From Swiss-Prot:
Entry similarity comment: Belongs to the universal ribosomal protein uS4 family.
Superkingdom of the source species: Bacteria
Gene: rpsD
HAMAP family: Ribosomal_uS4_B (MF_01306_B)
UniProt record, GO biological process: ribosomal small subunit biogenesis; translation
Keyword RNA-binding in annotation: yes
SUPFAM superfamilies in alphabetical order: Alpha-L RNA-binding motif
GO molecular function: rRNA binding; structural constituent of ribosome
One Pfam family in the UniProt entry: Ribosomal_S4
Subunit record text: Part of the 30S ribosomal subunit. Contacts protein S5. The interaction surface between S4 and S5 is involved in control of translational fidelity.
GO cellular component: small ribosomal subunit
Stated name of the protein: Small ribosomal subunit protein uS4
PANTHER family with a match to the protein in the record: 30S 40S RIBOSOMAL PROTEIN, SMALL RIBOSOMAL SUBUNIT PROTEIN US4M
Cited function: One of the primary rRNA binding proteins, it binds directly to 16S rRNA where it nucleates assembly of the body of the 30S subunit.
Origin species: Chromohalobacter salexigens (strain ATCC BAA-138 / DSM 3043 / CIP 106854 / NCIMB 13768 / 1H11)
């Protein structure tokens, strides 16, 4: 499946919530008419079946992290193989992706922009260039913007946006040095309460 490159608001409207696909400069409610689904004007949401709810939750999380269907299923399989709560482990695997960590550190204003920075070799992990967005960052890893990329306007803008958004507890960031430390894998309580990972587990357990 190809990566979606269409309007970001369309995806957020489809899921009925902010997927954080845009920079956050303008409030979500002003950017996207979230109460209306894409398509015919004025069309409202219908009551979903249990399967429909499970599918929508999976799509919401998959789109939020910018992961393709096959990749997402592989993350679920890996989470199911590990010891612990499968849904929580799934979210932790997604949060540990390098593109997500770059976004969390504020070097990219969106996960999509962070993914571009990684693929364009603007990011290093422990001093070594890594250009694989799905690279799993481990506790203690230091993620930094490479010297040649530090003057990019989009990174400077992203850091300004991140300052307003605030830092997350599991990451330390030195915005002046443009580097940060992934202190620990986040606990479930640290992550969005707007995600019901149990619905995803129910979907894939069928």
């Amino acid at each position: 499946m190809a990566r979606y490159i269409g309007p970001k608001c369309k995806l957020s409207r489809r899921e009925g919530t902010d997927l954080f696909l845009k920079s956050g400069v303008t409030p979500f409610e002003k950017k996207c008419k979230s109460e209306q689904i894409p398509g015919v004007h004025g069309q409202r949401r219908q009551r979903l079946s249990d399967y429909g709810l499970q599918l929508r939750e999976k799509q919401k999380v998959r789109r939020m992290y910018g992961v393709l269907e096959k990749q997402f299923r592989n993350y679920y399989k890996e989470a199911a193989r590990l010891k612990g709560a499968t849904g929580e482990l799934l979210l932790q695997l997604l949060e540990s992706r390098l593109d997500n960590v770059v976004y969390r550190m504020g070097f990219g204003s969106t996960r999509s922009e962070a993914r571009q920075l990684v693929s364009h070799k603007a990011i290093a992990v422990n001093g070594r260039t890594v250009n694989v967005a799905s690279y799993q960052v481990k506790p203690g890893d230091v993620v930094s913007v490479r010297e040649k990329a530090k003057n990019q306007a989009r990174i400077q803008n992203a850091l300004g946006i991140a300052a307003n958004r605030g830092d997350v507890a599991w990451i330390d960031v030195d915005s002046k040095k443009m580097e940060g430390t992934f202190k620990a894998v986040p606990e479930r309580g640290d992550l969005s309460a707007d995600i019901n990972e149990n619905l995803i587990v129910e979907l894939y357990s069928k």
